[in-house]
Amino acid sequence: AEIDFSGIPEDIIKEIKETNAKPPA
């Protein structure tokens, strides 16, 4: 599923992507 990043600041997008890249605890 794609996430709609429209209207979201670049730094927030980066933070979300980095969080998604981490394996679940």
UniProtKB/Swiss-Prot annotation:
Subcellular location: Secreted
Protein name: Hypotensin-2
Residue intervals passing through the bilayer: none
Cellular-component GO terms for this entry: extracellular region
Broad class of the protein's primary localization: secreted
Keyword Phosphoprotein included in the entry's annotation: yes
Site annotation Important for potentiating BK effects: residues: P23, P24
Family according to the record: Belongs to the non-disulfide-bridged peptide (NDBP) superfamily.
Organism for this UniProt entry: Tityus serrulatus (Brazilian scorpion)
Residues covered by region (Disordered): 1-25
Post-translational modification Phosphoserine, affected residues: S6
